[in-house]
Amino acid sequence: METTTKKARSLYIPYAGPVLLEFPLLNKGSAFSVEERRNFNLSGLLPEVVESIEEQAERAWLQYQGFKTEIDKHIYLRNIQDTNETLFYRLVQNHLEEMMPVIYTPTVGAACERFSEIYRRARGVFISYPNRHNMDDILQNVPNHNIKVIVVTDGERILGLGDQGIGGMGIPIGKLSLYTACGGISPAYTLPVVLDVGTNNQQLLNDPLYMGWRHPRITDNEYYAFVDEFIQAVKQRWPDILLQFEDFAQKNAMPLLTRYRDEICSFNDDIQGTAAVTVGTLIAASRAAGSQLSEQKIVFLGAGSAGCGIAEQIIAQTQREGLSEDAARQNVFMVDRFGLLTDRMPNLLPFQAKLVQKCDNLQHWDTENDVLSLLDVVRNVKPDILIGVSGQTGLFTEEIIREMHKHCPRPIVMPLSNPTSRVEATPQDIIAWTEGNALVATGSPFSPVIWKDKVYPIAQCNNAYIFPGIGLGVIASGASRITDEMLMSASETLAKHSPLVNNGEGLVLPALKDIQVVSRAIAFAVGKMAQQQGVAVKTSAEALQQAIDDNFWKPEYRDYRRTSI
């Protein structure tokens, strides 16, 4: 739908002088007009020339290019974000493909590990366990009253890097940057939060620079009571919030999601977002091959909350395509460090127990091993799709990939572990081991592979294709919950934007330069499904689209008018 461009209304603000220059959401730096400089007591506090935001962005781009390491580029961009958010997002949107890996994965992993070392300025909310009884007061200290999206972590499972304590704050900050850059959600509506419940990372506890609570992690009832205090305080302060759980440990991620998804509008991106983008990718890949996902055999390496979340969404999709639940589950094989999940395996977590294979169905397998390894599974299942969410590097060996290719002419291989140092196999190796026949999608960004003089672009199965659009759709529709069907609609919409499906060539996922188009489409699909599911007020399609347009923030300066506090 075409939209008309109209001039943004002036902002009436009470701040002036150095205070205004220190306010990242409002600071324009050298772009304050002559009149604004006079009205807001800025005369003489800025260089003479009044610049446009594009001139500022060009200077920032030149400065950015002067940094040689990715972590230095990350620090530089974070400094701009903490100084002038509008400029930060204009710069990032101008160079999204270059900068997304710098503001988020994989560089954000190093930033989390070095959080206390590279700390410059506070952003977001830090809630430590010793302050648990001051939760309401802490949230009242947040200056932005109209918060609509919170990303919260406890720092225990940061990417594939494990316990980073309050260093995990880098993840909510980076994630919310993508909500804005990709999904058009105003930075004024976003809030990163870290729940500081201690750390079991001895290196951090021994680090004199570590800025978090120096205490072993609280667990069990103490932990869940603390999280519940936080949830109740958030509901009191912002009843209509969208809350995203991020990088919680496996033992807590699924229980927290199960407990709160029907109490507050919430989702877990590691479980549901990863599942949605993976299923969208697989739907597109299957259609490009002239088949359906329900016709594929799928093997997972990694049976944690993320892997099982993906598996359950695949099962739901294949049921939509016509399989019975039992048949759908028989097509999915989960392998963890103890081997294939079977109905005779002890000590399975509840979400794993639904994904076991029955040992009676495996008696004909060609193996003498009691523990069924990934190679055993690949050799006997002859899968079409291999997905890695193990967080361990190098586990997709040459023998395993060649064995898969022996029975599958066009294997789909998805090493999704983050960051790049934890990937199960590199695209270069997978392409070589399959004689150039594999369709590869990764969790972290990789450069195109050149093999035998042919270029193979590598799709990044990035959650940023999904969660910004979900957030925009929830805000625009006023959805009170995020349902499984809303996530399915996001996957289906992503698949519809596949260049490989639509053009018969190219990447299985859209180019990052088109991610705002994809986010808008996902927002509409999610909002429409929310209305159909009864978790949002029904409106016309035109009204929903208008709400999406109205809520889509652009990094442009607005005129300021002076008002009193």
UniProtKB/Swiss-Prot annotation:
Disulfide bond as UniProt keyword: no
Reactions catalysed according to its record: (S)-malate + NAD(+) = pyruvate + CO2 + NADH; oxaloacetate + H(+) = pyruvate + CO2
Binding site for NAD(+): 157, 270, 418
Residues reported in the UniProt entry to bind a divalent metal cation: 246-247, 270
Superkingdom of origin organism: Bacteria
Keywords tagged on the record: Metal-binding, NAD, Oxidoreductase
EC numbers for this chain: 1.1.1.38
CDD domains hit by this protein: NAD_bind_1_malic_enz (cd05312)
First-level EC class: oxidoreductase
GO CC, any one term: cytosol
Annotated InterPro entries: Aminoacid_DH-like_N_sf, Malic_enzyme_CS, Malic_N_dom, Malic_N_dom_sf, Malic_NAD-bd, Malic_OxRdtase, NAD(P)-bd_dom_sf, NAD_malic_enz_proteobac
Subunit structure: Homotetramer.
Protein name per its UniProtKB record: NAD-dependent malic enzyme
Organism: Salmonella agona (strain SL483)
Taxonomic lineage from the root: Bacteria, Pseudomonadati, Pseudomonadota, Gammaproteobacteria, Enterobacterales
Name of the encoding gene: maeA
